[in-house]
Amino acid sequence: MIYPTQYDVIVIGGGHAGTEACLAAARMGCKTLLLTHNIETLGQMSCNPAIGGIGKSHLVKEIDALGGAMALATDKGGIQFRILNSRKGPAVRATRAQADRALYKAAVREILENQPNLDIFQQAADDLVVEGERVTGVTTQMGVTFKAPTVVLTAGTFLGGKIHIGMENHSGGRAGDPPSIALASRLRELPLRVDRLKTGTPPRIDARSVNFDGLEKQWGEEKTPVMSYMGSLADHPEQTCCWITHTNAQTHDFIRSGFDRSPMFTGVIEGVGPRYCPSIEDKVNRFADKDSHQIFIEPEGLKTHELYPNGISTSLPFDVQMAFVRSIKGFENAHITRPGYAIEYDFFDPRDLKYSFETKHIEGLFFAGQINGTTGYEEAGAQGLLAGLNAALKAQGKEAWCPRRDEAYIGVLADDLISMGTREPYRMFTSRAEYRLLLREDNADMRLTEKGRELGLVDDARWQAFCKKREAIELETQRMRTTWIQPNSAEANALAAKMPAELAREYSLLDLLKRPELTYDDLGSLKGEAVSDPQVAEQVEINTKYAGYINRQTDDIERMRQHENTVIPVEFDYMSVEGLSNELKQKLSEARPETLSRASRIPGVTPAAVSLILIYLKKRGLLKNKAALA
């Protein structure tokens, strides 16, 4: 049957990508349907119970700045918050939250169920309705067809999913959930490049069987941060600690003894695993000279005894898992509640996508999350939001939008995937961003919330809070610029102990704030009243101390933007460009970059090659300055 309601956007999958996608489309006023195989697993954390980390928290903050749910749910479910790289510069500082799985999932579901314009339906999607070269709907397992001009597919690890524990394997989307076999087969019929990837998870351990005596405790920050710009400490549940232990030589011997029954080493698993989150057997094999590897013991929640031993992801046989786990300090009598496993799944080459995350070959079909070759909740959520908002824009007949690399980590993520593709699960790092001093986690709202409001993603409450904060930053900066400290004054004497020399002349508070030895806390209330909002104070301090570097990066960006919007026609013949190597001709013909700027980021494409293409475009009268993402 055909369902009577006509939707604008249909989202398949209720994980981290799917939830952000459907919420974004609904916030923008589109009639949206979320199809999930099980409503009880909406927002489920399939692997580690944590949100954020280096590079990842930047994505979470950007999702939040655009009105998304991930940061809000993290504040509701976070049971430990830490600031990583706290002693380094603001560009690489990152917030990481340990989360209670149940509380996080409940927070996501509450947001979904209270979102206007959003319907949820429990049923697996088996087929896409494609008419000509455009998608027009989705057919479910029981034969119900839902119609919509745009569909966002966020299938996670479910497409052709296969779970491995030792030499045993079975079909599954994750432990306890069936895979999407029919939909995977249907997608393989489409003109899209497909391959296999692999990820894994560690065995879970009953805390009652662990000896915590002698294990190092790891507590959160004394001044607990919030993840969302709209969050507050009052949102946080009870805070708890984690622990640290290590593998040892005996652990490694047990692991090596299972190599002959490892699906990874025997060739049973064909998919490539994540480079930056390797299994314990991979670490022992690759780093044979290391005597031990660190393990973070993380609680799964406040009302469960299960622990997540971060660092020992494995697909070794269960008897080997038991042996090596019990060789680890604190785990001598450990009871494993769930075995570790690896899962292989289909992913599709992201180079077959536009920057809106719409497929190049099937109009109206968008991909987001692990289907695009990424790993991580945060990467999935960022893609989901971008795909969802662009599906909504397409349904509304509007031009697509994608932030540039100098505007957001979401833009870096999209550009990396679509211009270069990936052969292994892609994760975000701050090192991937050329302009990371501008793309800090602390200023994501200053960078993106205004655009989010323009797109219809940001509600009145968030917009008012943003405007109030922005005005407060401007006012406090101006106050400090016009407040002066005289030499030998009481204020100058109060600073003397922190300065290498006495003031020789009059200085404004803003000038003094530029000095590395002084902070906003030292100066804010020195003369007048300091701001009470720590986020405002942080922005004033960072913008002042790093002004020179920020201005330099801004100038670099302006130079790069000269060719940012120089369009390369879709039918452009690279083979005709004299001077380009055959290798570059082949790469460019395959990648089909939409602009000169994006062509320049393809590996091997030099500035000289970009110049040759530009000259060719000028000679043929093909120069255009508006990049059409839609």
UniProtKB/Swiss-Prot annotation:
FAD binds at G13, G14, G15, H16, A17, G18. NAD(+) binds at residues 273-287. PROSITE patterns: GIDA_1, GIDA_2. Keywords: Cytoplasm, FAD, Flavoprotein, NAD, tRNA processing. Transmembrane segments: none annotated. One of its GO terms (biological process) is tRNA wobble uridine modification. Homodimer. Heterotetramer of two MnmE and two MnmG subunits. Belongs to the MnmG family. HAMAP family: MnmG_GidA (MF_00129). This is tRNA uridine 5-carboxymethylaminomethyl modification enzyme MnmG. It comes from Saccharophagus degradans (strain 2-40 / ATCC 43961 / DSM 17024).
